[in-house]
């Protein structure tokens, strides 16, 4: 794969599961990776990564016998050996607390799956308006506090930084341009509080529309299209390896 991708790892338990907290799910995933590919686990823990090269989210419904983990990968080369070992072994078991779950399938199609080669992002035409759906609580760090608001600069400056960390072709753009030329024109959001196993985190969920001002340069429109598509894989805001900031692109014009 020559670009970011997202799959859903499906696991089965022998007895009904209680709804796990995000920290437990994240720990279970890292434990599975450590058993499958120790080198990858060490890389994912490396402090040299300002942004983690993956996101992880537990998809509903929660409880029951099945657990579905949505994994998006921003650095395909890092995970190449992991998938080779997965195929040879038929998957790796997941230990969630004291419960072992068996791998059932790797789902590569569906609403939260997909892939886009890096060059294709650059082929997207510039847009002036975009709508995004935030499926899980999303929050941004500003100073010493979390800010659960879909402010244009916080969202797109964060996506720009993630893009430049993941892609071999950086996007040269001043993040301040998002403050100057991009406006939040419509929003149907609500605040949710989630206990992640360590702290209560507040974030917004819902649908938000952004629109460029008439005098916005063309390169801002191209960045808006590129980063909106990239958000599906990169997630938005903080704690994206713990299920927060799950984003879907809805439409643009």
Protein language model regions, located:
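RNA-interacting cores
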Residues: 1-253
